[in-house]
From Swiss-Prot:
GO-annotated cellular components: cytosol
Task performed by this protein: Appears to play a central role in the parasite detoxification system.
Protein name: Glutathione S-transferase 2
UniProt xrefs under InterPro entries: Glutathione-S-Trfase_C-like, Glutathione-S-Trfase_C_sf, Glutathione_S-Trfase, Glutathione_S-Trfase_N, GST_C, GST_pi, GST_superfamily, Thioredoxin-like_sf
Tissue spec. comment: Hypodermis, wall of the seminal receptacle and spermatozoa of adult worms.
């Protein structure tokens, strides 16, 4: 099966998908386009949106739908209904945090960055710290010893927030250890080192 993932030349909404594909050693074409070129091809995509995954000749958009599609195909979606629901819940929480993050990044970076770091982020991270502790005492992955698509979403969210504030995880030992555990996975380590050396932007406006 051939895959092509089309997105802008940033991390953004596509990065958890890239991490999934890289870590699972799934071959794909990483199609990165310039923002200025998007208007001329926008009509080609469902909802006029990116990222877009081509699974053979099928086009899939919406980043969460893409992740769950891949998770079902490669058995990273939990082993039963409750596990699937649990990681869905986790990912929805990650999405909620990301909405708050992107609102600050794109709409009020200069005035809201410090209040976001000091007043909003700690409470949000505390929720994930508590939830992570419910499986295996938080000493491994979200589902314990089994990786799922939610691990890639959480890892990326923690990573971009550490760029925003390098000390944001200092009071959350389970999240900090989880982040390092994911970062040390061999394929992710190699990918992230190359990405970071290339200084790939996190967001489309250059702010991070």
């Amino acid at each position: 099966m051939s895959y092509k993932l089309t997105y802008f030349s940033i991390r953004g909404l596509a990065e958890p998908i890239r991490l999934f594909l890289v870590d699972q050693d799934i071959k794909f074409i990483d199609d990165r386009i310039a923002k200025d070129d998007f208007s001329s091809i926008k009509s080609q995509f469902q909802f006029g949106q990116l990222p877009c995954l081509y699974d053979g000749d099928q086009q899939i958009v919406q980043s969460g739908a893409i992740l769950r599609h891949l998770a079902r195909k490669y058995n990273l979606n939990g082993e039963n209904e409750m596990e699937t629901t649990y990681i869905d819940m986790f990912c929805e929480g990650v999405r909620d945090l990301h909405v708050k993050y992107t609102r600050m990044i794109y709409m009020a970076y200069e005035t809201e960055k410090d209040p976001y770091i000091k007043s909003i982020l700690p409470g949000e991270l505390a929720k994930f710290e508590k939830l992570l502790a419910t499986r295996g005492n938080g000493r491994n992955l979200i589902l314990g010893d089994k990786i799922s698509y939610a691990d890639y979403a959480l890892f990326e969210e923690l990573d971009v927030h550490q760029i925003l504030d390098p000390h944001c995880l200092d009071k959350f030992p389970l999240l900090k250890a989880f982040h390092q555990r994911m970062k040390d996975r061999p394929k992710l380590k190699e990918y992230c080192e190359k990405r970071d050396a290339a200084k790939v932007p996190v967001n489309g406006n250059g702010k991070q």
